[in-house]
């Protein structure tokens, strides 16, 4: 029974990821005044299936000089961790209700760095290694602000459980009192998922394809799926934190529809940003974090910790 529950979680995520690639190609196409995929199936709707068949039936080539074990394990680990992060999300029939769900998500997203590092190192290629080092530095740096913003928001809900956030936002979305944090969070999620304008790990102009340059066929598809699963996960988390989904116990379907709609809108914003902005320079990316976001988020955290004590003379609720 538990395996059926896991399958019911994983299969829809993988399907959503497959069609997200189609939505991205269509969106970018229309924004660049062209059609996008329109040959395979009606209006190109079967394009993701054709891509999957092509990638998984090709021979996965491996460079002779690469490290065999790590080269194979890295893409599998990337997808496994990307899917594991979905477990504590409060769905109508969630698999697991963790008391420390937020910490679990933070820990797993930190582990995801290893798959990128291993893939770049095991490829034994200069391009892949530079891409991997960039990705690791970028991801680890932006994790700092993500953690601080999470702490600031959780001080308002008073618990590390994700279901508590829904109860907290019954009357007002948390994006209203914490809009500066929400803006910094959204930009940090862009950097955390290595998306434009922070996609320096796969800078085509200088690194060909970044850390996955030596991967082909199935393993490449696994990295691709992991990246898009992470994007949707981060947007689902943003919805939970700042745009609390409407919840009525009598009609659980409303919660699901509300949650999915907001996540979709945020995901389309990711695609819109990709179509609109050029890539940042690496030093600008790091300056944005260490010189702008970090001092601001620390100041906001101190504000969230001190305001209950100063205004109501009560200690912060945990």
UniProtKB/Swiss-Prot annotation:
Its EC number is 7.1.1.2. The chain crosses the membrane at residues 2-22, 69-89, 100-120, 146-166, 171-191, 231-251, 253-273, 285-305. One of its GO terms (molecular function) is NADH dehydrogenase (ubiquinone) activity. It is a multi-pass membrane protein. It is an enzyme of class 7 (translocase). Signal peptide: none annotated. It is found in: Mitochondrion inner membrane. Its main location: mitochondrion. Belongs to the complex I subunit 1 family. This is NADH-ubiquinone oxidoreductase chain 1. It comes from Myrmecophaga tridactyla.
């Amino acid at each position: 029974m538990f395996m059926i529950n896991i399958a019911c979680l994983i299969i829809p995520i993988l399907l959503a990821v497959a069609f997200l690639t189609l939505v991205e190609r269509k969106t970018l196409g229309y924004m660049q005044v062209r059609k996008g995929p329109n040959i395979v199936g009606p209006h190109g709707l079967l394009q993701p299936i054709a891509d999957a068949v092509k990638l998984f039936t090709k021979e996965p080539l491996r460079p002779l000089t690469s490290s065999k074990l790590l080269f194979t394990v890295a893409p599998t680990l990337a997808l496994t961790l990307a899917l594991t992060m979905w477990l504590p999300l409060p769905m109508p029939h969630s698999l697991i209700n963790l008391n420390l769900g937020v910490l679990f998500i933070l820990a797993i997203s930190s582990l995801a760095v290893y798959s990128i590092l291993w893939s770049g190192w095991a490829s034994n290629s200069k391009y892949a290694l530079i891409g991997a080092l960039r990705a690791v530095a970028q991801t680890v740096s932006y994790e700092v602000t993500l953690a601080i913003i999470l702490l600031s928001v959780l001080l308002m809900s008073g618990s590390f459980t994700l279901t508590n956030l829904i109860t907290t936002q019954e009357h007002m979305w948390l994006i209203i009192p914490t809009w500066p944090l929400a803006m910094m969070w959204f930009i940090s999620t862009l950097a955390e998922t290595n998306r434009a304008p922070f996609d320096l790990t796969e800078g085509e102009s200088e690194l060909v394809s970044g850390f996955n340059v030596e991967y082909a066929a199935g393993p490449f598809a696994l990295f691709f799926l992991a990246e898009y699963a992470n994007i949707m996960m981060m947007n689902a988390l943003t919805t939970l934190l700042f745009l609390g989904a409407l919840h009525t116990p009598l009609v659980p379907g409303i919660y699901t529809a509300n949650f999915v709609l907001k996540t979709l809108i945020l995901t389309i914003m990711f695609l819109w940003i990709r179509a609109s902005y050029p890539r940042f320079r690496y030093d600008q990316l790091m300056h944005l974090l260490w010189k702008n976001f970090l001092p601001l988020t620390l100041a906001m955290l101190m504000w969230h910790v001190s305001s209950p004590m100063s205004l109501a003379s009560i200690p912060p609720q945990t």
